[in-house]
Design a protein with these regions (language model features):
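Thiamine diphosphate
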Residues: 1-164, 169, 180, ...
């Protein structure tokens, strides 16, 4: 996808907030002193009376968001994935999740692709953590088009939502005029019969590239974009697994508790088939240019292709 336009999903997050603000005066956006980096500041520039910089106090921000949401407003609370899912977990669980409030958490800078920020900021555990909260919807959009649609769907959704966005510009491939985003519904991007590649986030274009290279070797791979990790589209994944007989999950997240774990649980209960989980192993990341870090941890196209081919032997 070398010639495809690349945009970071955090850019789409900021754009979508501004567009929502034009139509909904009940929307408030909070940030924890990272408004420029998260792009929520774009909303603050347009609607300063509906934007609050809460300072470097993520737990306090979530508590404030919960209080405002309890009065009937919808609130997007924004910070880096490491700080929302990590530092503010208790407040998200007890103040947002337990009363099932309309707080939407915009978590940017997720995964290894934060690059130079290093292990302390490369949050590879957020999806696992957020999946455990009852009633929490968890989304990882795959490109800017999907990110914008996800933000708008999150606004319309009744209840808490966790959305992960990235800093790294990624290919914009959801350009089909018929593209439709629906919470909890995966999308078959390529039909196949030999193996199912289930991916999320910036690993979706990688899965498409892997499928293209497999096709050149006579392997017909099905590619599914699972933008909503919870609720998982178990029906779609199960049907594909039953057809192909083999499944590979690909994610920029720990292999523990993320997309791979969710898919394995669904298949164990509905359509047991061999599964390969590709992601960050039981380790921390490290500082370096994003693409180099992804390659070192086995999440670039050549590495994923090699893993899939080894699995298919």
């Amino acid at each position: 996808m070398a010639d495809v336009q690349k945009i970071a999903t955090r850019e789409a997050y900021g754009k979508a907030l501004v567009e929502l603000g034009k139509e909904h005066d009940d929307l408030l956006v909070f940030d924890a002193d990272l408004a420029e980096a998260t792009r929520s500041g774009k909303y603050g520039e347009e609607y300063p009376d509906r934007f609050v910089d809460c300072g470097i106090a993520e737990a306090n921000m979530i508590g404030m968001a919960a209080g405002v949401a309890a009065t009937g407003h919808k609130v997007f609370a924004t910070s880096f994935a490491m700080f929302t899912s990590g530092r503010a977990f208790e407040q998200i669980r007890n103040s947002v999740g337990y009363p099932h409030l309309n707080v939407k958490i915009g978590a940017t800078h997720g995964g290894l692709s934060v690059g130079e920020d290093g292990a302390t900021h490369q949050c590879n555990e957020d999806i696992a953590v957020m999946r455990t909260i009852p009633g929490m919807t968890v989304i990882i959009p795959s490109d800017a088009v999907e990110a914008e649609a996800a933000v708008k769907a999150a606004y319309d959704h009744d209840g808490p939502v966790y959305m992960r966005f990235g800093r790294l510009p990624v290919p914009v491939f959801n350009t089909n005029p018929d593209y439709h985003f629906e919470l909890g519904k995966g999308i078959i991007l390529k039909e196949g019969t030999d193996v199912t590649l289930v991916a999320c986030g910036l690993m979706v274009p990688v899965a498409l590239e892997v499928a293209e290279q497999l096709a050149a070797e006579g392997v017909n791979a099905e590619v599914i974009n699972i933008h909503t990790i919870k609720p998982l589209d178990t029906e779609l994944i199960t049907a594909s697994a039953a057809k192909t007989g083999k499944v590979v999950t690909i994610e920029e997240h720990s292999v523990i508790g993320g997309l791979g774990s969710a898919v394995c649980q669904a298949l164990a209960e509905n359509a047991p088939v061999p599964v390969k989980v590709i992601g960050v192993q039981d380790t921390y990341g490290e500082s370096g240019p994003a693409l180099q870090v992804l390659a070192k941890y086995g999440l670039d196209t050549p590495s994923v292709l090699a893993s899939v081919k080894d699995f298919l032997k």
